[in-house]
Amino acid sequence: MFGIFRNKNSNYNVSAKKRVAYCIGINDYPGTRNDLRGCVNDAIDWASLTQVHGYTADIIKDRDATVSLGKNILKELVNDSNKYGKDFQGILTFSGHGTHVPDLDGDEENGRDEALCMYDGLIIDDEIREILSSFNKNARLWIVADCCHSGTITRNFLETLYDEELKAKPRYMPPSDDLLALMNIRQKSYIVRPQEEDMNEILLTGSLDSEYSWDAFIDGKFQGAMSYHAKKIIRNNPGITFDKLHAEVRKFLPSRQFPQTPQLEGREQNKVLKIF
């Protein structure tokens, strides 16, 4: 189903804790003309980085990254958090397209729900919040979402918005007409959007929801602009905290080449924790 990445160079003793990382990368979006190039590289790199720090890392890519598997991963993280409590540390990274759909439960000020584009469909942010609402607050979960959810772009424009010279492309997928029709008849879930202090996870995103997160050719290979800087900063500062990582990433982004503004969300007491 998906590959388990193991690094024999890990110097961490994980016997006392359960550390797991699920690293999702989707380049292939069949039938959309919106394939990406750097998302699988992101997943491999995040897996390598987390494994060095004592995590068992699973790489999920392209056709394996289905909606059902994505939801099962979230549920597994919740189950482990309740089984191991404070001894559990989970990481979930997602590199791929993001999109938006009409907000039917009134929890979004902009009238749109954000969604992750899996290989075969969408996982709506409401669904993610509902699953994670049962996550043990004594455990820890870091989510990295290197995708974008901007609703300011049209289908026709997106097809031409690819800079061959810069080899950069936004990680945004417009929702299909069929999907929008389906969402319009979806039953309301009445999920309340949580405040940061109520979040069970620490969330690092590639951009504001009004911006693009860029898939770009950097240092000889395709990768996410935000992921590139975040991974490099962590490697150079292994004891860095979440808030300091965000501050360091913001020194590089937004830039003229990549006008995206990474965001950090979560409880304040969690933001000052060391990542590893």
Label each PLM-derived region with a short phrase:
Residues 1-276:
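Cysteine endopeptidase catalytic domains of the caspase/legumain-like
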